[in-house]
Amino acid sequence: MHSLFTLNLDLERAGKVICAQSLPFDTARETLLLLSPVGTQCCYMKNAALFLISHFNLIILESDTWLAYANEAGVNPEEGVADFIRQFNAALPEPVRVDALVGYCSSAPLALLAANQGACRTLLLLNGAYFLKDDGVIKSQYERDVERMMQSIPQGNCAQVYEAVSLLHTQSTYTPSDYRYQQVRPLRELSAFRQYLTFLNNLASLELVRIAQAVKTPTLVWCGSQDRYTDTASSRYIAQLLPHSELVEDPDGQHHDFVDGHERLYLTMTRFLTRHKQRAIQ
């Protein structure tokens, strides 16, 4: 019976990093590195983890940990992100090696950049939030609202914006033990909100068009037509840029399917990974 346990890693420059890891480790299984979206903790992924650990070795890493290093490394965000994943892979205990990288929502740009650094053999991008600068790409109202909030960092009015949106947190009925509580976690206090928007701005500064075009890794791009948070146009656009991509658009798909236990998505992921594992063996 596989379960999730705490994994402590000591990275050369980033220092101590705390993740979640499924045990016992099975060398016959592929190892997935799952990135939680910006502003969320590992527990946000528990429904997905319950399914995935029955098929794969699993490591869950919080995007905030990664971006905190990239933000303080004294280099541009792209170089900081790339440096972190190199340290992370070097710190993994033998014989653990990342086979597939999973980016969901705002962690998709991180996963994309890591894949460009050769961090995985297969890549899965699920309902990605890419913050594309191309005005020709349709964006949802939610994406436009978030981008306006992101502007409060360079404009210096983050505190005023926080006061306006923090009511969403106070009106939330989710308890901290409920994984859905993570959706409004950045609204608990001003410092968390400022960090959340700073990290999103770092992601928005990445040259994703150039990065996607350079990714050689086979990639599954999954999006849901009923997603009210991220418009499928961004996922379709990224899929067109990737040299080796498979685009799946679920006509009934919702944004939170990955964390809500949507079996159709999990089976699509499993089939994709199994197919490419067989090709690698051949």
Curated annotation (Swiss-Prot):
Residues 169-261 form the AB hydrolase-1 domain. Keywords: Acyltransferase, Plasmid, Transferase. It catalyses: holo-[CmaD peptidyl-carrier protein] + L-alloisoleucyl-[CmaA peptidyl-carrier protein] = L-alloisoleucyl-[CmaD peptidyl-carrier protein] + holo-[CmaA peptidyl-carrier protein]. Coiled coil: none annotated. InterPro entries: AB_hydrolase_1, AB_hydrolase_fold. The active site is at 105 (acyl-thioester intermediate). In vitro, is able to accept L-Phe as a substrate when presented on CmaD and is able to load this aminoacyl moiety onto heterologous T domains. Thus, CmaE should be useful for shuttling different aminoacyl groups between T domains existing within heterologous nonribosomal peptide-synthetase (NRPS) assembly lines to generate natural product-like derivatives. Involved in the biosynthesis of the phytotoxin coronatine (COR). Catalyzes the transfer of the aminoacyl group covalently attached to the pantetheinyl arm of CmaA to the holo-pantetheinyl arm of CmaD. During the shuttling process, CmaE generates a covalent-aminoacyl-S-Cys enzyme intermediate by the action of its donor substrate L-aminoacyl-S-CmaA and delivers it to the sulfhydryl group attached to the phosphopantetheinyl arm on CmaD. Belongs to the AB hydrolase superfamily. This is L-allo-isoleucyltransferase. It comes from Pseudomonas savastanoi pv. glycinea (Pseudomonas syringae pv. glycinea). The lineage of its organism: Bacteria, Pseudomonadati, Pseudomonadota, Gammaproteobacteria, Pseudomonadales.
